[in-house]
């Protein structure tokens, strides 16, 4: 794997994948939204090419900026990830159309492998161990849209001779985690020597560090050569209070 393209490049897992790719001397084209406040997250490297865009729907306008053949197309970008938007059907539906556009983008680049970032939310509420072969039963609009986008992009890839791989992301944490997560809340309180308040912490969570998630997606792109689905998780689920 000599070169990759990433949408959602300034997201936590996007940055982690970029760092992993650069460590393996893989050239990276990072698609970044104009005006993003997270540009400083990206590392500096002659192998990293930042390509700015106003909207992913306008991908044709940046084709000329992709100056090398792309071996793997990673689609991490997703709108309306904030908690208040996760059950908004109309908003989440926008992501399905964008995801299909990204397969068209992949095809326009003559790239033969498309990696989609799925989600634990596709399985719906569960208390037992989850396997990638399990039946999906999403409840929130976010999970429904993720599964719809996963299946539809897989179909479109199949129609165009493109390998489709999906990593369904569970609970990832790290230096670029979003504000407001439990871990960020706790760390912030502890650093300021303030009290932090929690529930009894009986819920079970499978936490994975962002670096490991970046490595997982790198390996998916590098090693997978046929249609593929996996869970991106540690495989160990523990009650929150233990963490």
PLM regions and their residue ranges:
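SDR active-site strand-loop-helix element
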Residues: 7, 31, 73-79, 114-120, ...
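NAD(P)-dependent short-chain dehydrogenase/reductase
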Residues: 128, 151-205, 210-214, 218-221
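Mid/C-terminal beta-alpha module of Rossmann-like enzyme folds, strongest
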Residues: 186, 223-243
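Active-site helix of classical SDR
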Residues: 141, 145-148
């Amino acid at each position: 794997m000599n070169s990759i393209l990433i949408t959602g490049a300034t997201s936590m897992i996007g940055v982690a994948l970029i760092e992993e790719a650069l460590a393996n001397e893989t050239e990276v084209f990072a698609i970044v939204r104009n005006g993003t406040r997270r540009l400083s997250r990206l590392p500096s490297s002659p192998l990293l090419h930042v390509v700015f865009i106003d909207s992913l729907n306008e991908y044709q306008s940046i084709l000329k900026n992709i100056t090398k053949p792309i071996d793997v197309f990673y689609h991490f970008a997703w709108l309306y990830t904030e908690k208040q938007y996760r059950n908004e059907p109309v908003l989440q539906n926008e992501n399905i159309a964008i995801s299909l556009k990204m397969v068209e983008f992949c095809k326009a680049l003559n790239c033969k492998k498309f990696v989609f970032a799925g989600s634990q939310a596709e399985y719906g509420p569960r208390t037992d161990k989850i396997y990638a072969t399990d039946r999906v039963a999403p409840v929130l609009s976010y999970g429904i849209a993720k599964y719809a986008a996963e299946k539809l992009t897989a179909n479109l890839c199949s129609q165009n001779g493109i390998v489709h791989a999906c990593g369904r992301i569970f609970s990832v944490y790290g230096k670029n985690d979003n504000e407001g997560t439990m871990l960020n809340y706790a760390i912030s309180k502890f650093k300021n020597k303030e009290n932090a308040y929690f529930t009894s912490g009986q819920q079970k969570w499978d936490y994975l560090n962002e670096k490991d998630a970046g490595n997982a997606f790198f390996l998916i792109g590098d090693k997978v050569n046929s249609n593929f689905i996996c869970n991106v998780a540690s495989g160990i689920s523990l009650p929150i209070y233990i963490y």
